[in-house]
């Protein structure tokens, strides 16, 4: 099965910049919101299509957003690169919230949580055991003062704890990665995989994960 990994941090903390040391063919970037990288690179970047990549216009926003998730799953499956980065993955939740803001009731929040969770689960179920998918995701401060994965409020948090869907969660701050919870974040990683504080070099992280689990390079 493939491996989803969460990279979380505030805007400008160095999440996307951590991709800089990858070369073309080593990683592909699926961008939810932006269309460019913050450095010169020949890394392949594709943007999630506003129409979900379907031929017929979706009948409603719920269907449209499911199509976007399906498109992302297809891109991951078809990618020849051993590593994938979903940049600004929190906007999958945010954009769907705004798309469906006119809908009443709580069911839409359950559906939003399910869409995001199902994407993570689909990666876990992919047959390619050498593929790693990084979710580059913004953070927010919780009621205890810790940095947590940004969602769209308590109604979704009651349905889904995003960090719980990942075995590896790295917290990015001031262009460094923190690999374990130190009281200020919900970071976590397997014992002995990383030092507590490491440079925000996702290429080096990728190599460490592959060595730890005995994964190939695709």
Predicted regions and their residues:
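Short, well-ordered beta-strand core segments
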Residues: 27-29, 133, 169-171
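P-loop NTPase motor core
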Residues: 83-160
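Conserved GTP-binding G-domain of TRAFAC-class P-loop NTPases and closely related GTPase folds
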Residues: 142-218
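Solvent-exposed polar/charged
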Residues: 20-21, 125, 164
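Conserved nucleotide-binding/hydrolysis micro-motifs of P-loop NTPases
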Residues: 24, 33-37, 89-91, 139-143, ...
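Conserved P-loop
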Residues: 1-79, 83-84, 91
């Amino acid at each position: 099965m493939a491996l989803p990994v969460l990279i979380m941090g505030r805007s400008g903390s160095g999440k996307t910049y951590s991709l800089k040391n990858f070369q073309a063919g080593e990683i592909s970037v699926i961008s939810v919101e932006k269309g460019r990288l913050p450095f010169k690179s020949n890394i392949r970047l594709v943007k999630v299509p506003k129409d979900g990549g379907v031929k017929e216009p979706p009948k409603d926003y719920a269907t449209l957003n499911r199509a976007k998730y399906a498109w992302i799953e297809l891109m991951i499956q078809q990618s020849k690169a051993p590593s994938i980065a979903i940049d600004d993955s929190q906007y999958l939740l945010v954009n769907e919230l705004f798309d469906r803001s006119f809908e009443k009731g709580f069911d839409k929040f359950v559906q939003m949580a399910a869409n995001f969770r199902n994407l993570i689960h689909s990666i876990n179920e992919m047959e390619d055991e050498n593929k790693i998918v990084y979710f580059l995701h913004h953070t927010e401060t919780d009621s205890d003062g810790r940095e947590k994965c940004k969602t769209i409020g308590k109604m979704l948090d009651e349905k889904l704890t995003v960090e719980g869907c990942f075995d590896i969660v790295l917290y990015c701050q001031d262009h460094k990665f923190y690999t374990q919870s130190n009281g200020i974040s919900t970071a976590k990683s397997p014992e002995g995989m990383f030092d507590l504080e490491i440079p925000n070099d996702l290429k080096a992280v990728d190599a460490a994960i592959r060595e730890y689990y005995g994964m190939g390079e695709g």
